[in-house]
Amino acid sequence: MVVNYNDNGELTMGGTSLKTIAQSFGTPSIVYDEDQIRNQIRRYHKAFEASGLSYNISYASKAFTCIQMVKLIDEENLQLDVVSEGELYTALEAGFDSKRIHFHGNNKTKREIQYALDNQIGYFVVDTLEEIDLIDKYADSNVDVVLRVNPGVEAHTHEFIQTGQEDSKFGLSIKHGLALNAVNKVKATKHLQLKGIHFHIGSQIEGTEAMIKTAKIVLNWLASERIEVSLLNIGGGFGIKYVEGDESFPIEQGISEITEAIKETAQALQYNIPEIGIEPGRSIVGEAGITLYEVGTIKDIPGVNKYVSVDGGMSDHIRTALYGAQYEALLVNRNEKANESVTIAGKLCESGDIIVRDA
C-alpha cells in the first residue's frame, strides 16, 4: 500500500498530505507515487536479467499516460505500447524515440496508420489480415510488423478481460489457420517485414499456468511451421491487488517460471529463442495510484442502504460499473475505524454509477 496516515490523521503518499493535494488541485484527482512506479519497473528488469534471456519491456500506455509518465518510462529504459493516435501524440510530445514505440489495436484507422508511418514507429502489432494490406498500401519504405496470434487459451479472469480464447475479437487464430495465413501474407507484401509474434491472453492474471501453456502452444506452432522470428512478445495482464484477498502477480517468481518454461520448450523443439518481450501496464502503475474524490450528499435509506455521493463517477471510474470490480475506500482527512457499511456513488445519471459497494 502506497498510502498511510500521518500523526495528524491525514492520509499521505510519499510523505505528502493527500488532503493538501485535493485542496491544491481539486477533485477528482488521480495521484501516483513515482518511487513505487520506478520500483515496479526495476523488479521486472531484475527478473529478466536473472533469466539470462535477451528481453525488452514495453509499458502499456493505456494503463495511464501523460507527458511526465512517458518521460519516466524513458528514464527507466522501457519501450512503449500505444493503441491510439492520442497516445502516440503524447509519446512524441514527450520526446520519446519513435523507434521504441509499438502500435497496437484491433481496428487501426487509416489516419492512425499513416500518422504512425510518418513518425517511423518501431513496429505495428497486426491484429487482422486486412490490416496487413492497409499498412503495406500506405508504406513507402520497409516496415516491421509483429503478428498478434490467438492461442485459444482462456485465462482465469473475468470474461470481459479475457483476450486469448477462440472467440476473442483480438488476434489471428492459430487453430483456424489465420495466423499462418498472416505470416504468408506478410511475406508476399512489398514493404512489410515479419519481426515477431505476439500474444496476450487477458488481464488481472495472478499466476503463470495460462501464460506458460500459451507460450508452449506458440513455440510449438512456430517450430512446426519453421517460422523464425527475432521477437516473441508474451504480452502483459499481470494482476495487482485491489482489496484484501486479491493476489498480485509474483514478478520475480512468475518471470522465472515463464522464462524457464520457454527455455525448456525451445530446447526440446530445437528452436532458437528470440528476444522475449512483455507489456506490463496496470502492474506498473495500478498499486502506485489513488483517486481522490470529495464527498457531497449523503442519502440514508433506513434499513436499506446508505449512499455517499462523490464528485466523480463512471466517467472517470468505469471498472465497478463495467464488471463489478472491487475497491477499498479510505478517508483522507481522518483515521477512524469503520463503524458502518455504505455505498459510494457517483454523480452521473445512471443507477449503475457506483464506485465502491459495501465500503
Give short role names for the model-derived ranges.
Residues 1-124, 129-144, 180, 184-193, ...:
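A charged N-terminal "starter" segment
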Residues 58-60, 81-83, 102-104, 125-127, ...:
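A cross-family glycoside hydrolase active-site/sugar-binding cleft signature
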Residues 271-359:
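Charged (often Lys/Glu-rich) extended helix/loop segments that serve as interaction or gating elements
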Residues 93-96, 117-118, 137-141, 162-164, ...:
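Solvent-exposed alpha-helices and their adjacent loops that cap or buttress functional pockets
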Residues 3-5, 11, 170, 344, ...:
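Short clusters of hydrophobic/aromatic residues that line enzyme substrate/ligand-binding pockets
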Residues 63-65, 86-87, 107-109, 128-130, ...:
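Active-site-proximal loop/turn and secondary-structure-junction residues that shape catalytic pockets
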Residues 152-297:
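Active-site loop/helix belt of alpha/beta enzymes
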